[in-house]
């Protein structure tokens, strides 16, 4: 019989400062918290929380995703967070409010959405 593979338990890093990356699309919201070097500490998304289809794109789903991430980050000792927001989705403001309500102190909010210099033609809803 094969031996059981021994795996190390995940070590909780003590990271007091971090960066919250909120990526919102028309279909989903992904919230990732990294340390200052860009190494992921924790992440969550509306889809990972069990929302399916059009419910993933709601502000409520984004709020729950941000709450889950904030709780996990605070377990790692995180207190202050800088926020980078990407994308045009409906969960932008809800995610920021949720991070703040969960107890993380937001030091800066930056919108880093990539704007094309007239690149590809977007799909039909954003064109209108």
UniProtKB/Swiss-Prot annotation:
GO terms for biological process: translation. GO terms for molecular function: rRNA binding; structural constituent of ribosome. It comes from the Bacteria. Keywords: Ribonucleoprotein, Ribosomal protein, RNA-binding, rRNA-binding. InterPro entries: Ribosomal_uS11, Ribosomal_uS11_bac-type, Ribosomal_uS11_sf. GO terms for cellular component: ribonucleoprotein complex; ribosome. PANTHER family: 40S RIBOSOMAL PROTEIN S14/30S RIBOSOMAL PROTEIN S11 (PTHR11759). Part of the 30S ribosomal subunit. Interacts with proteins S7 and S18. Binds to IF-3. Located on the platform of the 30S subunit, it bridges several disparate RNA helices of the 16S rRNA. Forms part of the Shine-Dalgarno cleft in the 70S ribosome. Belongs to the universal ribosomal protein uS11 family. NCBIfam families: PRK05309.1, uS11_bact. This is Small ribosomal subunit protein uS11. It comes from Onion yellows phytoplasma (strain OY-M).
């Amino acid at each position: 019989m094969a031996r059981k593979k021994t795996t190390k338990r995940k070590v909780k890093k003590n990271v007091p400062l971090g960066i919250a990356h909120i990526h919102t699309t028309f279909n989903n919201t992904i919230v990732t918290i990294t340390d200052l070097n860009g190494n992921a500490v924790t992440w969550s998304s509306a889809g990972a929380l069990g929302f399916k289809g059009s419910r993933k794109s709601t502000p409520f789903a984004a709020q729950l995703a941000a709450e889950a991430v904030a709780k996990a980050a605070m377990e790692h000792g995180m207190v202050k967070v800088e926020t980078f927001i990407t994308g045009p989705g409906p969960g932008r403001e809800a995610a920021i409010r949720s991070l703040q309500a969960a107890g993380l102190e937001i030091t800066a909010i930056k919108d880093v959405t990539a704007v094309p210099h007239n690149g590809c033609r977007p799909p039909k809803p954003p064109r209108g």
